[in-house]
Design a protein with these regions (language model features):
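Charge-rich, low-complexity N-terminal segments
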Residues: 1-122
Length: 122
């Protein structure tokens, strides 16, 4: 069997972007980020889960919620870079959607984690 699960989170956090062009996003500003993480498992762990939802929330909220993301990360905190960080954070996570505001969403997929089962991915 293959198990697919997802976890939705809301994070309140601020950031400023370092960009090669003039933008108001270069100033410190905040968002209520909507994040959805997608996990895959070919087996369940000893507790009968792919990953514990509360562990996911604790790891992400503990690092990002009510934080200045420029002080948290050593990379430019774009939605795309945050998505990549989230996918890399959990071995079971193959996809992250990171919405910083309505209409502005990045989707990051780790193709290696779903190689061979792409046709099954919801």
């Amino acid at each position: 069997m293959i198990y697919f699960i997802s976890k939705k989170l809301e994070i309140s956090a601020a950031h400023s972007l370092t960009l090669s062009y003039e933008s108001k996003c270069s100033s410190l500003h905040g968002h209520n980020w909507q994040i959805e993480l997608f996990f895959v498992g070919r087996e369940l762990n000893q507790d009968g889960t792919v990953i514990d939802f509360t562990h996911v929330k604790k790891a992400v909220h503990g690092k990002m919620d009510h934080a200045n993301l420029n002080e948290v990360f050593d990379f430019n905190p774009t939605a795309e870079n945050i998505g990549r960080w989230l996918v890399d954070l959990f071995p079971e996570c193959y996809k992250a959607t990171v919405q910083e505001s309505f209409g502005n969403t990045a989707v990051v997929v780790d193709e290696e984690k779903i190689r061979g089962i792409e046709h099954l991915v919801p």
